[in-house]
Regions:
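Preference for protein termini
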Residues: 1-506
């Protein structure tokens, strides 16, 4: 939709004398399921307080208007080339990420709870990383099994004893948060190269244009400052005489998140570089430019540890910079996030994060973990094998929804093959219950219907403060009955409106 063709239901004050109900009006095809927390409706079918204005407006919309709205926001994504890459059996294909035109809403109080929990969690994880690459007291005290940490593929012995600037190992974090009837919980920590923030910003831009009146009327907190805040965070990690030169290190245009790398570099005014664009002389990192070499002070890397430096890590890497880690150890360049942070987002280490919060902060976790069974233990393996049909089983180092088994949606043959993998290498897997993920309103297949969602907020930790964008990448399982929200597995995204006030969580 253009600015001159807004839908008739985009009104700041829709008539609330007849608010929408599940199963009627525009929600005629909306079916509630008591197993799942519904973000829009209460159990009796009435609108939640936070959804009353938007839900009332949607209830009065005709399908043609909603289809036009959906087409407009999708066309914007196509026009701007907002893509991701899906890895298939034979090849990789670039696709436009699907966007849903109905925003998800959270109250100020709900967001405050998430915000406080994420700050607490990232503080503890940074302290944990400093400890395991330092004196290792948490390992000696048995908070986390030493063999789990030291044997993790993401643990980098090269980082031992290295003084990380301001003790900030993780400056950029994307934490996946889910909601059930029991409240909010953390599903996964993404500490290495978290992605998706460009989709968050793109969703917001599309929805502000498509529903400007409803957007203004909801008094939504803004997220547009993220690139500016990211630059400030990166710049704060070192001591500079003037403004530091920041570069975004990308694997290149064939990477699944290349759109995001280019977007963030452009928004920050940073250099977008590949490994071949950088060179190290006398322990200093320079970018090759048409006017000669230019020193780089901070590297926001979107390249995995293994490929950062062929001298220190994988010798066959063509993506990294020879000598980069030497320059980093010498303190001549900042790398964010620091190498070796992946050990703290390993899915087996995840199970111990509540204990790490208690150990390092002497606080109870604000955000709960999901119950997790470690197949590396005899009890965890036995439980997982006995209940395979009812569990989600994940590789401890996996991501993107690849390499996992969703028990209720699997065949007997798939479970048999997965059980063989578990018995062969139990240390590579964890299992969790199938979560009753909350459902939010989406426009799919020509109707307003509920779909399962999660959200990935983005947390920035600088020298003196922590900043969290008041929103996040809200991911949607667009397939009816599906629980996997990853874009690589058929998921999409939608805007998340965090309200400044109003709306009881009920």
């Amino acid at each position: 939709l253009t600015a001159s063709s807004h839908a008739s239901f985009d009104r700041a004050y829709p008539d609330e004398s007849s608010p929408g109900e599940a199963g009627s009006g525009g929600f005629a095809h909306y079916e509630l399921d008591a197993r799942f927390y519904d973000e829009t409706f209460r159990g009796d079918g009435s609108l939640r307080g936070v959804s009353r204005r938007l839900g009332t407006a949607l209830s009065k919309a005709v399908p043609e208007e909603l289809a036009q709205l959906q087409e407009g926001v999708a066309r914007r994504f196509i026009h701007e080339g907002i893509t991701f890459t899906v890895i298939g059996a034979d090849k990789a294909s670039e696709q436009i990420i699907p966007i849903d035109c109905v925003p998800r809403l959270l109250t100020a109080g709900e967001w405050d709870h998430i915000d406080r929990g994420l700050r607490q969690r990232l503080t503890a994880l940074n302290l944990f990383l400093g400890d395991i690459y330092g004196d290792g007291k948490s390992l000696r005290d048995g908070i986390v099994p030493p063999d789990l940490v030291l044997g993790c593929p993401q643990y980098r012995v090269e980082m031992r004893g290295l003084q990380v600037p301001n003790d900030i190992y993780v400056a950029v974090c994307g934490t996946d948060v889910v909601r059930t009837h029991d409240g909010f919980a953390v599903l996964e920590d993404n500490l290495r190269v978290p992605s998706g923030v460009s989709y968050m910003l793109a969703c917001r831009a599309a929805m502000k244009q498509a529903l400007p009146r409803l957007y203004r009327a909801h008094n939504v907190r803004e997220i547009a400052r993220y690139p500016e805040q990211l630059y400030a965070t990166l710049a704060s990690l070192g001591s500079w005489a003037g403004a530091p030169r920041v570069a975004v290190l990308t694997p290149g245009r064939y990477n699944s998140a290349y759109y995001e790398h280019a977007f963030l570099a452009g928004e920050m005014g940073a250099e977008l570089v590949e490994g071949r664009d950088l060179v190290v002389h006398d322990g200093i990192v320079y970018a090759r430019t048409v006017t000669g070499l230019r020193r780089i002070d901070v590297i926001y890397r979107r390249v995995d540890d293994d490929f950062l430096d062929p001298v220190t890590f994988r010798s066959d890497s063509l993506l990294g910079v020879p000598g980069l880690f030497h320059a980093y150890r010498a303190g001549n360049v900042v790398i964010a996030n620091a190498p070796g942070t992946g050990v703290a987002d390993d899915k087996a280490v995840y199970a111990y994060v509540p204990d790490l919060i208690r150990y390092f902060l002497d606080e109870e976790p604000i955000l709960a973990n999901v119950d997790t069974h470690l197949c590396r233990t005899r009890e965890g393996l036995a439980y997982t094998l006995d209940n395979l049909e009812d569990l989600v089983v994940k590789e401890v180092g996996g991501s993107g929804g690849y390499g996992m088994l969703v028990g209720p949606h699997s065949t007997a043959g798939e479970r048999k093959r997965f059980a063989a993998r578990l018995r062969s290498h139990p240390e590579n897997f964890i299992s969790q219950p199938v979560l009753d993920l909350s459902r939010a309103t989406c426009f799919v297949e020509g109707n307003l219907e509920p779909r399962h969602v999660d959200v990935r907020p983005f947390v920035l930790r600088g020298r003196s403060d922590t900043w969290i964008a008041p929103g996040g990448l809200c991911r949607v399982a667009l397939r009816r009955g599906g629980l996997v929200v990853n874009s690589s597995q058929g998921g999409g995204c939608k805007d998340l409106w965090v309200l400044r006030d109003g709306g009881a969580p009920d």
